Amino acid sequence: PNDAKSLSVLPIQNRTFKAGLETDLSEQLKGLLQSNSSVKLLPAGQADLKLSVTLLNLELPSSGLSKDQISTGTQAVLKGNAFLEDRRKGNTVWEEKMIHVKISESEGIQIENTSSLTLSGNIRELINRFAQNLYDRIFTNF
């Protein structure tokens, strides 16, 4: 957008109860962006565009998922928001107020013990989906 050639990903804000999600998301997102030859990743003060992401909520069967969601096979839901700002003009070029990704039983992914859940398997898949969803929205919109 706006003939921008570069992008910076600001530190991701994590408002979920699960530490480490922001680090994993940052790695996934930067990996996707680095694989795109049409955009160059630069520090915030040098990039044309700044991407801000906030993880708002991680819902699991033990915390946050409704009985209806659980009964229909939902295993985990991650919600967040993002906005893209043009540093040169100081305006928001794009905003996504609710990014929502989920994992369901039908996908063959099981979350057995949520109290010992680590950043592996299921949660990584949720983060991968969030990063891909965000990436697709940025590059599909423009």
Predicted regions and their residues:
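Surface-exposed short loop/turn segments
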Residues: 36-39, 46, 50-121, 132
